[in-house]
């Protein structure tokens, strides 16, 4: 009885062997025409569906680039750091997903837009806790909100309505 090779893809028809085939080698895994070395391959045949890697995922994430069959565990892509949202809790979207992006602040991440662009603060203040007007409850108008507003925001009389307060964040 002959043995089934893996050329042409993976699946139930791509694996298995009888007693005359010997043991499986270290190269007996993966998908595609070259996935079996030697050609006598024992089950299970590990396949990524679709085939994926850190480089093939890129900025897309792992949503459509994962899964496996044959009981072989997870595919490589799901284990890559570039397949994880980098700014999910900082005010930036998951579309900012690439390996160089997993840093605490969005301002350090080249693909993230500043999350506090309309709050009067600079991009260096880009995290979820600071995406609020800095003088909203201090008695000062929003026009008095500047990047330096962690200091008293009513130091100038034109900012005070009706009296001077300190910024409360």
From Swiss-Prot:
GO terms under biological process: epidermis development
Gene Ontology CC terms, in alphabetical order: cytosol; intermediate filament
Expression across tissues: Restricted to hair root, not detected in any other tissues. Expressed in cuticle layers of differentiating hair follicles.
Sorted UniProt keywords: Keratin, Repeat
Function noted in UniProt: In the hair cortex, hair keratin intermediate filaments are embedded in an interfilamentous matrix, consisting of hair keratin-associated protein (KRTAP), which are essential for the formation of a rigid and resistant hair shaft through their extensive disulfide bond cross-linking with abundant cysteine residues of hair keratins. The matrix proteins include the high-sulfur and high-glycine-tyrosine keratins.
Assembly and oligomerization: Interacts with hair keratins.
Family stated for the protein in its record: Belongs to the KRTAP type 5 family.
Protein name: Keratin-associated protein 5-9
Organism from which the protein derives: Homo sapiens (Human)
Gene for this chain: KRTAP5-9
